Regions:
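Gly/Ser-rich "nucleophile elbow"/oxyanion-hole loop immediately N-terminal to the catalytic nucleophile
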Residues: 57-65, 109-157
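Short glycine-enriched nucleophile-adjacent loop
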Residues: 156-166
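Short beta-strand element of the alpha/beta-hydrolase
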Residues: 63-74
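Bacterial N-terminal signal peptides
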Residues: 7-15
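The feature captures the conserved acid-bearing segment of alpha/beta-hydrolase catalytic domains
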Residues: 169-248
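N-terminal cap/lid segment of alpha/beta-hydrolase-fold proteins
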Residues: 22-64
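Short amphipathic alpha-helix adjacent to the substrate-entry channel of hydrolases
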Residues: 80-100
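Alpha/beta-hydrolase-fold serine-hydrolase catalytic core, especially in secreted/extracellular enzymes
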Residues: 231, 240-243, 248-301
Length: 301
């Protein structure tokens, strides 16, 4: 083999290696409808996760940091392929979203092993580390005092499994709820299965967002809500079934209350809070939504 051929082959291998090591990224739906156009991307320092974040970080600093949404996927899928429009839209309103699983460059079902509960903890660990790292582009730009952990279906079970983590300041349980002894046999194998007693470990406000009576998680979620009396809790329902509206443009109708919940509780936006408060909450002015609160909910600021 000649020297020229060897050099050519070496160059090809180097090109392949460089391409494979480049982080993937994609602008989804023109960056969302929010003030801060967002991007979906991989971060080499956070493997097996997808990050949604404003494209331009110059507006964020220690006095105006990005609150955090940590997300777990339906079916414990190791990719947010069903939820990326919803998550991207939230990021465009000034949040950093850390989703469990591999980046979905196309809207197709992910085929691979299930995700784990630990991946949500890895997301929180990463946010903390990046905010403290002076060499990181996220240095002093992440609001580590305002972290919501959330998830859909199996991702909601992962969220409840992790609910005791003291770094969490808010929860959002979507199309999900803990199984009881009577219906545990309906669960898909591999799902985390905390007992109902786990609800006592919740130490933050929590919102359940369900798809109405046709949602297979409706009974579990409503039962959870009725058991939670020690922290502010609400449950909202929209009659769309278990799949929600996440795959619709910008996440569809579910984005409206989810974003308001995050803006109110993580950013202190009182106007957003009117979605859930007052004589006639804003959510009830929207077609087909219902809202129930526990006794502690109206004490929320």
């Amino acid at each position: 083999m000649t020297k020229k051929v060897l050099l050519f082959m070496l160059g090809c291998f180097m090109m392949i290696d460089t391409a494979s090591s480049q982080s993937k990224e994609l602008i989804v739906e023109e960056g969302g409808t929010g003030r801060y156009k967002s991007i979906m991307k991989e971060e080499a320092s956070l493997p097996a996760h997808t990050v949604f974040v404003p494209q331009d970080l110059s507006a964020f600093n220690a006095t105006n940091p990005l609150p955090v949404l940590v997300w777990g996927n339906g079916a414990c899928t190791d990719s947010p392929w069903e939820h990326f429009k919803f998550l991207n839209e939230i990021a465009s309103h000034g949040f950093i979203v850390l989703a469990t699983g591999y980046i979905p460059m196309v809207e197709e079902p992910y085929k691979g092993p299930m995700s784990t509960t630990q991946q949500q903890i890895e997301s929180i660990d990463w946010a903390m580390a990046q905010n403290a790292d002076s060499t990181s582009p996220y240095y002093q730009k992440i609001d580590t005092k305002n972290i919501c952990v959330a998830g859909m279906s199996c991702g909601g079970l992962q969220t409840l499994f992790n609910c005791a983590d003291p770094r969490i300041t808010l929860l959002m349980i979507c199309n999900s709820g803990l199984f009881n002894q009577q219906n545990a046999g309906q669960a898909v194998g591999g799902m985390p299965m905390p007992p109902k007693e786990k609800l006592k470990e919740i130490h933050t406000p929590v919102m359940y967002m369900l798809g109405g009576e046709t949602d297979i998680a409706y009974g579990n979620g409503m039962d959870d809500f009725r058991r939670i009396q020690h922290v502010p809790a609400c449950v909202i329902n929209y009659p769309v079934g278990h799949g929600g509206t996440y795959r619709q443009p910008h996440g569809g109708e579910f984005t409206i209350p989810a974003l308001a919940w995050l803006q109110w509780q993580l950013k202190g936006d009182k106007e957003a809070g009117k979605m859930f408060t007052g004589k006639t909450p804003g959510l009830l002015k929207r077609k087909d939504w219902t809202l129930e609160k526990n006794a502690k909910f109206d004490k929320l600021q």
